[in-house]
Swiss-Prot record:
Residues annotated as signal peptide: 1-19
GO biological process: collagen biosynthetic process; negative regulation of cell population proliferation; peptidyl-lysine hydroxylation
Entry-listed glycosylation sites: 327, 458
Organism this protein belongs to: Mus musculus
Highest taxon of the lineage: Eukaryota
Active site: 662
GO molecular function, one term: iron ion binding
SMART domains xref list: P4Hc
Principal location class: endoplasmic reticulum
Protein name: Prolyl 3-hydroxylase 3
EC supergroup of this enzyme: oxidoreductase
PROSITE patterns for this protein: ER_TARGET (PS00014), FE2OG_OXY (PS51471)
Ranges annotated as biased composition (Acidic residues): 688-698
GO CC annotation, single: endoplasmic reticulum
Amino acid sequence: MLRLLRLLLLLLLPPPGSPEPPEPPGLAQLSPGSPPQAPDLLYADGLRAYSAGAWAPAVALLREALRSRAALGRARQECGASCAAEPGAALPSQLLGAPHPVSGPGVWEPLLLRATLRRAECLTQCAVRRLGPGGAARLRVGSALRDAFRRREPYNYLQRAYYQLKKLDLAASAAHTFFVANPTHLQMREDMAKYRRMSAIRPQSFRDLVTPLYWAAYDTGLELLEQREAALALPQLEEALQGSLAHMESCRAACEGPEEHQGAEEEGEGSQGGLYEAIAGHWIRVLQCRQHCVADTATRPGRSFPVQDFLLSQLRRLHEAYAQVGNMSQAMENVLSVLLFYPEDEAAKKALNQYQTQLGEPRPDLGPREDIQRFILRSLGEKRQLYYAMEHLGTSFKDPDSWTPEALIPKALRERLREDQEKKPWDHQPPQQKPLAHWKDALLMEGVTLTQDAQQLNGSERAVLDGLLTSAECGVLLQLAKDAAQAGARSGYRGRRSPHSPHERFEGLTVLKAAQLARAGTVGRPGAKLLLEVSERVRTLTQAYFSPERPLHLSFTHLVCRSAIEGEQEQRMDLSHPVHADNCVLDPDTGECWREPPAYTYRDYSGLLYLNDDFKGGDLFFTQPNALTVTAQVRPRCGRLVAFSSGGENPHGVWAVTRGRRCALALWHTWAPEHSEQEWTEAKELLQEEEEEEEEEDILSRDPSPEPPSHKLQRVQEKAGKPRRVRVREEL
């Protein structure tokens, strides 16, 4: 415990001279010299003014709320740095492992607590000077408001208020700032398109007011390197690295604030046990938060996953750029810094040998960058404590770094952590393309033919197959969809305008709803049975074609019809279904696809089985990740299946249906059995129950004393049980 508390106080000391993060552009202080007001009150007043249509007061209050929130973070970081640099702030030598430490039980305790009290006094006085009396407590906000600021919601209100005030350039800046962090926000996507069509708005107004500047420097540096302008790229890359380290310091300073752990303490996690248990619990949460700052710094706004080895990637580019301009000493510093992360990195060792050869003489004075050495030593010290707590106190810790030496992890934890990393690798690995011969050997069903393979469709893991349905089977399923739509007013499942286009009507039917309607006599039972049989037919073929080594499970089955609304098709410019991927959020601007909600991340393969072709438009098309360049197009017809992997390698959309009614069976498959479609099983059981009841009725009809109808009805109701809830999801 003594060693743990020594390290605790050592790591509480941030490096002196930490750079101060700049205030976000566009948030100039509205009341110079005065301490900030409570951000929660300012934000609430701003929303009230917004709701009342008082646009100018709303703008002033919302901007002041943002400034006040930023002021607290700056004050906390500056106070931490200044208190650590004060004379006498050093810890007593006895707590730092001096050659002759104080002996005796409890002798170290007064020294530890005295140092803690002095630091607390310094931080409190600094907060009073920066924020006013009681400022730290007054400016504390709850988790809901912190989340709102993290999602940049104030900028959503600001853009609307600026628009009402006819300040279009400011509106565009606020809208762009919100959209960067919320790229899937459909309303803001439409608003951004409108702003870009306005000639009065200058192109430079579409700027992010919040994103740390190091991202812009990083992107600029990469672009210059691609253009082989290493001399111009170096200042940008250095700025990006220093900005990344400064952002990490700001994030770490925020970890020491009480509000970051308020939620855990409210749930009682930090209030159990005595003094030392409370200290250890709070300190562990601080360390967990600090370690997460690596991922926070490496995560672009609007993304949920960080850039892998972000600092390391910057160091690699720096040593290569310095070598290109002939600065071998700086190149050696940066490549030696790379080797601090991965000592056995072959590419880095090879580059180091080249640089040493070009220098011509040994340079013992050259070593890794000091800022990177401090970062690694501090990070390893924190990891060591977290793994100790994980082993002995039962806490949790997810290491954000892949470079952590295995020797640092206690042996008792290594196997457990290795098992956790090996769980469900298909959740993270994209499907691998298989040879063409494999595709042709997978056609097992009689009458099914391969019309186009992945190569002919200009992509990977996509195929078009014909012959899965006869014309009679297509007719049965089309009649099922028609009967279900006509029964919509009675069943509560009426058609409605498409969620993807106001110019089309959308009708959907799940397998369970079809079975329920069939049991009620609203639709024919043959159609409901065929829907189940066909979905299993598609699953079997998709598994044989794409995934013979691993079972696929139906995840969701949906019979969908889209009908063109008459009189609303002239000069139509939209799509029936916008370009998207099925298991990840597609970002056309960067070409990346993020496997995260709201996407159905557990989907692995998709299928579209078409029922008709007597309509205009409605072709399926695949695009490049930019969602603009069409790579392949497929015309629907009865019995044609388009099957493909569900990830970002297969962005797709549907052209507008401008006449007629387009019907298809949409199916999604998963490798994860826990995400298999439960409604499919329920629908099958429901139809089997009905068959059994009909057989029993046939037997009873030959019985001289049949059961009274009232008793029969009661028995059927008891057997059916409670009505099942129907999930209705708007799918392709």
